[in-house]
Amino acid sequence: MAKLHDKYQETVVAELAKKFGYSSVMQVPRIEKITLNMGVGEAVADKKVMEHALRDMTAIAGQKPIVTVARKSVAGFKIREGYPIGCKVTLRGERMWEFLERLVDIAIPRIRDFRGLSAKAFDGRGNYAMGVREQIIFPEIDYDKIDKIRGMDIVITTTAKNDEEGRALLDAFNFPFKK
């Protein structure tokens, strides 16, 4: 079992229940899922690009990503409906906790010129979205085997009712927010 999951069950639930005055532990916000999304627009011209993106995403997430396709044709981007333009993976359960642990302890400290995560990236319902500019911050990616540096979006979906609860939940997991 992931250390963060144990920490959540043992200490975070009690702390948040006390802080927000919940009558039941089931009211305490929890992390529902983590979604990783990588837009690969260059895949329209070169199919190999999508294979590399899928390989990187599989290594990072530990599960096979789904290929996302264009919903409609856009002449300006030279894409047609149904063209593969990205990949995404949704992590839940044990894999989600393990990924969160690696993100907080290993990946985020490896971001170049890192000054803290923006606290403004909450969506109003306690969910947090962040962007990563390069996939090489994850230890699973071998720098010599990548074809190109790609970024990705990471969305942490919580059961929090508002941003304050979501922020308190992520703070409890030592997320490095800007002061």
UniProtKB/Swiss-Prot annotation:
The keyword Cell membrane does not apply. GO terms for cellular component: ribonucleoprotein complex; ribosome. GO terms for biological process: translation. Gene3D superfamilies: 3.30.1440.10. The keyword RNA-binding applies. Keywords: Ribonucleoprotein, Ribosomal protein, RNA-binding, rRNA-binding, tRNA-binding. It comes from the Bacteria. GO terms for molecular function: rRNA binding; structural constituent of ribosome; tRNA binding. Belongs to the universal ribosomal protein uL5 family. This is one of the proteins that bind and probably mediate the attachment of the 5S RNA into the large ribosomal subunit, where it forms part of the central protuberance. In the 70S ribosome it contacts protein S13 of the 30S subunit (bridge B1b), connecting the 2 subunits; this bridge is implicated in subunit movement. Contacts the P site tRNA; the 5S rRNA and some of its associated proteins might help stabilize positioning of ribosome-bound tRNAs. Part of the 50S ribosomal subunit; part of the 5S rRNA/L5/L18/L25 subcomplex. Contacts the 5S rRNA and the P site tRNA. Forms a bridge to the 30S subunit in the 70S ribosome. This is Large ribosomal subunit protein uL5. The gene is rplE.
